């Protein structure tokens, strides 16, 4: 018997900036009956780009969840940003989606962000579809994009299910569905019948040849030169897609609506249901505990979900977007955050439509919905990736989300007294929504230091402070977000003693341990002393506060710690009158001396830089990169006579790279940069 989740498809739309993700989302909403008229990115009228900054800039900044029906199925899609500075939105979308649609521009081909996002999708084992859009544009090159896909997808082979038919000048005459033999596309001219027959024969030959290599069931048909019936073909395509052996490729134009209905049919036919995703190798590794044993005393599954993001909006109000992996959630249910040891009661359940929502009584396993708190209490401090459990469920923590560390910082100062007063709270609220925003109090009163993933990211932070929180700011020059780690393991104790009077001496002893961790581990802080201590709660909190401040940059280097485990092992005092300030001081002494003993190492962020330019300019670009301490990884040709260079380069060397590249290339080159690694900053003593 079919389960309700068999008729659910959750997928993210991923691509490079300006490839057409948001336009495709608009067209999907139109085709599924959710929109009478499609909005336009250039007019700022799209459903999924609802932030003021998105509509002004014409780009997606936050991921937007939209639920719509198609042929008896419930589709939930996430339109994700295409700019590298908003990687967190893409990362958490990939974590909770069951599949992905990669959108490629038929003119520009496989661009840098497309490649980066697909690598991350492949890391989650996501099956997917590809849609080559903008075939209505001059210079569209479907075959060239297909060849690039073959290099990008690695062992997963592109499987074209449709092909464009063009005249000798490259003008699009029609798009051929290889499964049905039907034509769609421009209505003003029909391609010659012999061209259609040749394209159909050749396209089906390649389709069958590709499938026969990974699906034995079609090998006999291929060897006999026979095209299988539609049912057998769909089954073979579906099985190969779910095993990540192929990625079906559709094509058309989102703006004109060509190929979108065919794409939606492919979504329900070939992409996995939530249950199939859970049964995949990735699902079994990630959710080993969600089996028959995870049932309530009533015999039904406990509700288990992952927090995707906190959304603050005028309508429908603040809510938490979640993905359910088990059970049912409904209004009035008490939920427990397994990561933060806090509970809260669900007030409303929302079906999401970007900035809009529809209230529903409940949601079940496989769905992506919004949960609001009751009117009596606000949403608690739940972070993206936290595991939420129905009250009474056994303790379970699902795999957490990982986000890149900030690479750039700005010192912000409120313009007037009210701005300076409200700035910290506004930054704290933004950081709750976006886990890649970090902030701390600045070097002077009224100042804060905000850190993010790039210049655009921090520009948007300032714009949102002004438009959403009415906080106007002045900003200093961008600064690279360095980090500190340690070279070796160190364990020591320090004692702080002070005589307050001839008869009263206060004393505290703190023992700590520093240990280097592998790359991308972040800072891990542990307080095992609390398991056996008899110290008052206030003293324990003072010790934890001192340690947290030290990790966040309150140390001799001035930079936050990373790739380091700090363990506060023992804390003791012989004087019952010892207060919090004494423990605070003793902890800081132990931490500072331990950092020095372990060998502090300042790390600089290194970026993976990709530059695309006309071929004749790539030499000058490479010379400039060499002067910026770049390590060139590859240089290759692009369709249309362009060249691409990929290099690793320290962030400090490319803070103002956009201006320099514009000068070198006369404005004809483009670049993207994504965090790649942390490396030891030059000039430090060994």
Regions found by a protein language model. Give the residues of each.
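Structural and coupling elements of P-loop NTPases
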Residues: 1-686
